[in-house]
Amino acid sequence: MGRAYSTIAFDPAKCDGCGDCMTACAQAKTGTDDIARSRIQIYGREGAADKTFELALCRQCADPKCVTVCPAGALNKDGTSGVIGWDATKCVDCLLCTVGCAYAGIALDEATGHVAKCDTCDGNPACVPACPHGALKHITTANIYNEVGDWEDLFAPGLAGCQGCNTELLMRHTLRRVGPDTVLATPPGCVPGMGSVGFNGTTGTKVPVFHPLLTNTAAMLAGIKRQYKRVGRDVQALAIAGDGGASDVGFQSLSGRAERGEQMLFMVVDNEGYMNTGMQRSSCTPYGAWTSTTPVGETSRGKTQDAKNLPLIMVNHRCAYVATASTAYMEDLYDKLDKAIAASKNGFAYLHVYSPCTTAWRFPSNLNMEVARKAVETNFVMLWEYTPQDGLHFTKPVDDPLPVTDYLKAMGRFRHLTPEQVEHIQKKVVENQKFVERMTEHAHVG
């Protein structure tokens, strides 16, 4: 399998042209405050109605044209880091590389008489933390791909999920990480609906899998785990259930096994409704959302109740580990998977993953990650973790959240909202944030 590389991402919507990134780069690379010598440059966009900015920075291209046009072989792409390096001993200062780069990422440093370009500061770019607005991010998710990309995909190819299904992405990543020595429970919902328990007489997974009722997933898995222990088999007990099968009809089973501290990892794929059976509302469906059972018309404007906060309910069970996660933040998700797996060896671990549904939420499948990311950036979804020993703390705190409308407008299920409904949702987001923040102030919730 090929190799992926870390990169520096730029969000022009957050850039105000302050130049702090250029100053930081100049200081790190030249020991001066001369931004003309910075290897990152921010330029105002000419003729724009609003003041917007563009980035001139080496993109460390997969097929770098600067390397191709260099007649002296002074530029080469490092196969480990992905960074295009410059060898001063070979450079003839012809500047052809500056012409070959489409991103203005390599330029002449007049003070030295040689070209200069970004080398990502050996993996710790000085420009990123210097940006006060978060317009620059060092994306290191490639590390996950490089680590697990060659691990076996334990779900069969060609599952019957909707185009761009976030749940399928989550299923494949989870099983890769948990590994083959696993017994899997998937109650009725999108996960078995797309093939985890089989289709045409063939199972969709490469691990033992069973299909419990909506009402008894955790109880049945606990019994199976205990039987494996009786015969001396240390297997990973894993449930992947939807929010309906966990927060509604399956809650008594979930709550009972959590209270007993059964040794399992229970993962909830929260797409905020019963999506497999026709997009009906669940108790995790947010206020105002359209579903087939909370329609929009003359007398109805979507769901009239706020969503149940199931993760916080599980915190009050004093589980060995509780966390929220999102596929938009894969490093955070993998870190929590590791902790949940470890905690499940001695107790009950609960992982609640927010999973946008392209079909029911009514947005294009190519915007899946953007919708998931906006949920976190607006604090509509908060990412945190809890253990009885360390209490609750944020793993991706958002101190300056975007307005909730930035999230709501991305989906058709909220397009009918009145200003009063939007105000209610924004107020609830702020209330939820303050509530969780109060919980983080106490070292031990239990």
Swiss-Prot record:
SUPFAM superfamilies: 4Fe-4S ferredoxins (SSF54862), Thiamin diphosphate-binding fold (THDP-binding) (SSF52518). It holds the Pfam family Fer4_6. It catalyses: phenylglyoxylate + NAD(+) + CoA = benzoyl-CoA + CO2 + NADH. GO terms for biological process: L-phenylalanine metabolic process. Residues 6-35, 49-80, 82-111, 109-141 form the 4Fe-4S ferredoxin-type domain. Involved in the anaerobic metabolism of phenylalanine and phenylacetate. Catalyzes the oxidative decarboxylation of phenylglyoxylate to benzoyl-CoA and CO(2). It can also react slowly with 2-oxo-3-methylbutanoate and use different electron acceptors such as benzyl viologen, methyl viologen, FAD or FMN, but NAD seems to be the physiological electron acceptor. Also catalyzes an isotope exchange between CO(2) and the carboxyl group which proves partial or complete reversibility of the oxidative decarboxylation reaction. The keyword Membrane does not apply. Signal peptide: none annotated. PANTHER family: 2-OXOACID OXIDOREDUCTASE (FERREDOXIN), PYRUVATE SYNTHASE SUBUNIT PORB. Dimer of heteropentamers composed of an alpha (PadG), a beta (PadI), a gamma (PadE), a delta (PadF) and an epsilon (PadH) subunit. This is NADH-dependent phenylglyoxylate dehydrogenase subunit beta. Induction: Induced anaerobically by phenylalanine, phenylacetate or phenylglyoxylate. Its EC number is 1.2.1.58. Its cofactor is [4Fe-4S] cluster. Binds 3 [4Fe-4S] clusters per heteropentamers. GO terms for molecular function: 4 iron, 4 sulfur cluster binding; metal ion binding; NAD binding; phenylglyoxylate dehydrogenase (acylating) activity; thiamine pyrophosphate binding. InterPro entries: 4Fe4S_Fe-S-bd, PadI, PorB-like, THDP-binding, TPP_enzyme_TPP-bd. Optimum pH is 8 when measured with benzyl viologen. Half-maximal activities are obtained at pH 9 and pH 6.8. Keywords: 4Fe-4S, Iron, Iron-sulfur, Metal-binding, NAD, Oxidoreductase, Repeat. Activated by magnesium ions and thiamine diphosphate.
